[in-house]
Amino acid sequence: MTHPTIGILHPGAMGISVAASAQSSGCVVYWVSDGRSSDSHQRAQEHNLQDAGTLDNLCATCDIILSVCPPHAAEQVAGQVIGQGFSGLFVDANAIAPQRAQQIGRMITEAGAAFVDGGIIGGPAWKPGETWLYLSGERAREVAACFEGGMLETAVIGPDVGKASALKMCYAAYTKGTTALLSAILGTAERFNVRSELENEWSRGGSDFAGQTQMRVRRVTAKAWRFAGEMEEIAATFEAAGLPGGFHLAAHDIYQRMAQFKDAPNLPELAKILTALSNDGS
């Protein structure tokens, strides 16, 4: 069986695990070193990705290109690939609203390439059964076959572009949305000097909810800069469904106030996080 060659844009924490799963399934995976960070270089070298050097070389070499990037950059990455005359299969696996996935799909197909919509649920795919790539589109099964031997689980949920992204948005609306809500609750309780009493109430009956919540808030700070944009996408998804998007627009603001902790070498103390929340992140 001949496996397709795959290009990954880009090998961040999630992207490199996606690339590794494709490699485990027999695919050769390429990346673009031009303009990328030292962390990306290190990840690519550790996992033996093939360096295409530039985007034009990647587009000329690969059968399938997967976009795994921050939500705000989804159209930019797709546009850059189109600009190189890519005529293969483009997979957008970013955390974007379904209507944006459909728009990108039109961009890609009008340029002469094929498109599959993807949505990743879970963290980086280093353990079986924990991370799922949902796929929708006419050629979704071709993409799923590229990961059948790796840690990344796949599920094809239909031919309609936007369906995979909609599922991702609905799932993250709860998981990441509630973390933002809990962060805001702790920040408010701290400001009114009732956090101790609140956490005591949470701890009745031996529950560890208070401790779990504190750790959940501390851990999310490293990714808050990225989650902020995702909350805007969820809000847009809700509004497209005729529902109010205000829940997640507020969650966007919460994560934006945490963005200063992106490159912290250690988990920040809860007190520092709550101060940042009540001071507009400054």
Question: Residue spans of the language-model regions?
Answer:
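NAD(P)+-binding Rossmann beta1-loop-alpha1 motif at the extreme N-terminus of oxidoreductases
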Residues: 1-60, 84
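Helical "substrate-binding/catalytic lid" subdomain
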Residues: 167-269
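Hydrophobic beta-strand scaffold residues
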Residues: 29, 51, 114-116, 154, ...
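Rossmann-fold dinucleotide-binding core
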Residues: 6, 96-176
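Rossmann-fold NAD(P) dinucleotide-binding segment
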Residues: 55-115
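Short, basic/aromatic-enriched C-terminal tail that caps enzymatic domains
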Residues: 266-282
